[in-house]
């Protein structure tokens, strides 16, 4: 295996220097394992997009963290940002509910606006570029097998990313949706940051507390109270 195979998915320098496990190279064995798996299986997201969340959102810009579980496992969906799909791709059910809730917080926009998939709404890169870290706890997955890389070793790395944000950033809103994400609450210093928890936006649970949770408006109000710009959801 060439060095280019391993480093095609290198994290950006700011994160690599700040996150202890990245600085120590703990991600390299994981990338090697993923590279081996790609030889015989389809793995998402595509090569070069594994650390997209970190590339889109520099550490010093982080003001919101949304924690996902693992990448979408369908063709053409995963591109390295939790809950997001590329522009023009039909939104999976969980993303539809995220967009619906975000749109419902805009008094000037009908809730149905979040259901569109022919505009920028399905690609959450604009959120990421405003400092919203869209982080899955497992950064890769095998096609058609949800959770297949959960035991690969990503969780130690992504836990360290969350911990680093909590330690280094002055004021961040952490949105933890569903039991898996809520387990990460222990990594967050709630004396400095705002923790917003809810059920998962999956259609199986969204109507049990996610839709109508008000997380997006709560986050912006909390940020504004600290002199920070609100996120344009």
Curated annotation (Swiss-Prot):
The active site is at residue 70. GO terms for cellular component: cytoplasm. Its main location: cytoplasm. One of its GO terms (molecular function) is uracil DNA N-glycosylase activity. It is found in: Cytoplasm. GO terms for biological process: base-excision repair, AP site formation via deaminated base removal. Keywords: Cytoplasm, DNA damage, DNA repair, Hydrolase. It catalyses: Hydrolyzes single-stranded DNA or mismatched double-stranded DNA and polynucleotides, releasing free uracil. It holds the Pfam family UDG. Gene3D superfamilies: Uracil-DNA glycosylase-like domain. Its EC number is 3.2.2.27. SUPFAM superfamilies: Uracil-DNA glycosylase-like. It comes from the Bacteria. Excises uracil residues from the DNA which can arise as a result of misincorporation of dUMP residues by DNA polymerase or due to deamination of cytosine. Belongs to the uracil-DNA glycosylase (UDG) superfamily. UNG family. This is Uracil-DNA glycosylase. It comes from Oleidesulfovibrio alaskensis (strain ATCC BAA-1058 / DSM 17464 / G20) (Desulfovibrio alaskensis). The gene is ung.
